[in-house]
Amino acid sequence: MAFKEKVKELLEQGLAEYPNLFLIDLNINDSNKIIITLDGDNGVQLQDCINISRSIDNNLDREEVDFALEVASAGVSLPLKLVRQYKKNIGRTLKIKTATQTIEALLLEVSDQDITVEWSSREPKKIGKGKETVVHNEKIAYAAIQEAIVIIIF
């Protein structure tokens, strides 16, 4: 079995033991540096990274193939990629970039095809001078989202 396939198989086995964790990204470069990015339904703890790292490291032979292994959690600054990530962030504010707009909106609902968000903006009054606050509620298809990042509010 090729090295990359062996790593993928071991990773799948490791994640099967921890169903609350899921893979965001797996990258194996030409010098056999393995970079695994994880997320979890309840976040990712250091021990989760250690457990997945050990499930791979303990089953690969460094005498056979020299490699480096890095297991990390998806940071808050990384864009959301999977529906499962959107689901765990319902009720949080996202910065969403599409081809036509960039908005900061509250994530209300998540389906397999799209998300529903709500945000407000100041717009000119239809009658008279000045501006009024308008609340927008919109469904955005995943295909239309170029980037979505969770905004951390302190």
Swiss-Prot record:
The family database entries (Pfam families) matched by this protein are listed as:
RimP_N (PF02576)
Signal sequence span per UniProt? none
Q: Per the UniProt entry, what is one GO biological process?
A: ribosomal small subunit biogenesis
Report the sequence similarity comment from the record.
Answer: Belongs to the RimP family.
Task: Please give the name of this protein.
Answer: Ribosome maturation factor RimP
What's in the keyword line of the UniProt record? Answer: Cytoplasm, Ribosome biogenesis
- Please name the InterPro entries in this protein's record: Ribosome_maturation_RimP, RimP_N, RimP_N_sf
Q: What does this protein do?
A: Required for maturation of 30S ribosomal subunits.
Q: Which organism is it from?
A: Flavobacterium psychrophilum (strain ATCC 49511 / DSM 21280 / CIP 103535 / JIP02/86)
Q: Which GO terms describe its cellular component?
A: cytoplasm
Gene giving rise to this polypeptide: rimP
Protein's cellular compartments: Cytoplasm
Keyword Cytoplasm present in the record's keywords: the answer is: yes
Q: Which domain of life is it from?
A: Bacteria
